[in-house]
Amino acid sequence: MSSTGSAQPFELPEFYVPHPARLNPHLARARAHALDWARGMGMLEGSGVWEQADLEAHDYALLCAYTHPECDASMLSLVTDWYVWVFFFDDWFLEVFKRPGDRTGGHTALERLALFMPDGPPGHDVNARAPEPRNPVEAGLADLWARTVPGHSPDWIARFSVSTRNLLVESLWELDNISIGRVANPVEYVEQRRKVGGAPWSAGLVEHAVGAEVPAAVSAERPLRVLRDCFADSVHFRNDLFSYEREVGKEGELSNGVLVLETFFGCTTQEAADQLNRLLTSRLQQFEHTFFAELPPMFVRAGLTPEQVAAVLTYARGLQDWQSGGHEWHLRSSRYMNRRAGLPSGPSGLGSATSGLKALLGITGGADRLRRHTRTPHPVGPSVIPEFYLPYPTRLSPHLEGARGRLVEWNRAMGMFDEGLWWEDKAVDYDFALCSAGIDPKASAADLDVSAAWLSWGTYADDLYPLRFGATRDLAGARAQDARLRSLMPLEPEAPTPPPVNAVERGLADVWLRTITPMAPAGRRMFRAAVDAVLDSWLWEVENQAAHRVPDPVDYLEMRRVTFGSPMTASLARMAHMDVVPEEVYGSAAMQSLEAAAFDYSALMNDVYSYQKEVEYEGELLNMLVVTETFFGCDYRTALRVVNDLMTSRMKQFEHVLEKEFPAMYRDFGLDAAARAALDRYADELKQWMAAIATWHAETRRYREEDLERHHARRSAPVVAAAAGALPRAPHRAGWA
């Protein structure tokens, strides 16, 4: 039962806990130290937030002893102090700013806290004098920063500083939603919870506690990002399940995953809790998949030393310890709804060994794991197109007709009609010039041609990779092709490049030079990074296809933004405003929310239209409807309704950000009229982008059943088998040019 003794709003589900929790032997010392430290910082009697009894009942030392079982006594005390500070900050911000709805005061307080966290770039004095603390939160942060940061690399300090700032600043997002009674949509919630929930910050502390920094060379690579994000989501979802009664029932919080799913699906609290637990299990299993399937290739590609590999593995084990230990603490702390507070670890009596074995063997969630690998292609019939919520019209360029003809000739010149994958009638049917004409209706004819070429090239490659590399499980060939494509994107137009040997290479080499030649060096680097991200995502798709694996829902959606080419869209738009919009604005919650909502909306629309093409004709698994069917175990119509509801919620979030969050962002950053006008134009460009993509999907002859039958029949002709031999092969194989 909960600490109040009242009926629980739902029964806690059966959790997936594959690793046993361990307890640090220095617990008693950490408890005593935490009490003295909190009192010394002014967090107890007289603070108006906690009394000694509160701290003792919450027992953060027990949390840290479970989540950091191997560190020594002094390190455990330091880590415990950090968690005392974080939880005190959360309760302090609630009492002082959230309850009164004082956004201005909250923003001022958070700005001051940043002064106690020097970024620590190379050459910076991390012990630089900070202002005199005015309250327990500032005093605690000043003390902890000075005790933690010295001795760490600039990369770790920068990452830890960002995650700590996010933890603090995103409290304003929660405050804003409370003030207007708004419950976030599921995708928005996951993204914001990572920041305000603090688990990415906890991951940084794990590096500190285990004495194993993640090497800077790989700290931003996808496998490390996924490990961190899976860790964060799992920690947050678990906390949401245990804290629902207190946060939602007593404190009026709206930032809770159970409430988010309850609101989105219109289901009961119990049903929402069960679904959140399934998502928690899925994220933990994604962590395991990433550890075993993605880390080893990354080690080889990055050329890490044995010591660096050991550091990454030690860090990953630390995250694993945190998951199991955090679960054990939630079962005990009086802060949460639980049935076993204060009881010995694990069940006792007859059958207890079997219960523990079930958790260790991962039987909980086993059916979901199996279902992700056993999906088979099958006839599905024509894709059903629902009524989409899209409040923005499409305007078309007057250069459209000319661009259509020029694009077909460009396809021919690049050799896209010579490899058995595309032919002229097919390219005409696809009509990418129509999409470009709506994305930028004011573009010159030349710029429209470049835009259409990018869309055509990207789709050609998107058709090529699954057929040539995914279906054949030729991961080496995919990586070889990837390396050659990267070699064709010099930052200087005059730089020598290898001669292209196939259509996808010729297309990239041509459109790359036409795009970057007029750019400034900074713009070229930004755009190169965006295209690199898209290339990375294509390899991820091939790897999933080779493993015959339906992705985790969160991982899929986040990667879908990239596979859809969204980073290229964002980078080109940002270049137009680089001179008037400060770079840090693009990292703000409002800007990231706006972009992600737009990108998700259009990527999911593509999944709705392409369902029959990808599932029935191509046997692919990377489609949000397939992911939804697999995760929920539901039929196509139900999955379609869920995806369309998600699209609608993302579009409404886009509108909400523009109406509510952009004005606040303008004030928070003190932006002048020119910067505000530039960002308003960017928002209008995103509206045009979404509307153009919707118009193109409705009119293209790429997804209709009669066109699929015609296109598929011709692609299946013997010419395809002959042409496949001319497609890229791994460098060590005969025939590579």
Cite the ranges covered by each PLM segment.
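Alpha-helical, largely C-terminal catalytic domains
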Residues: M1-A737
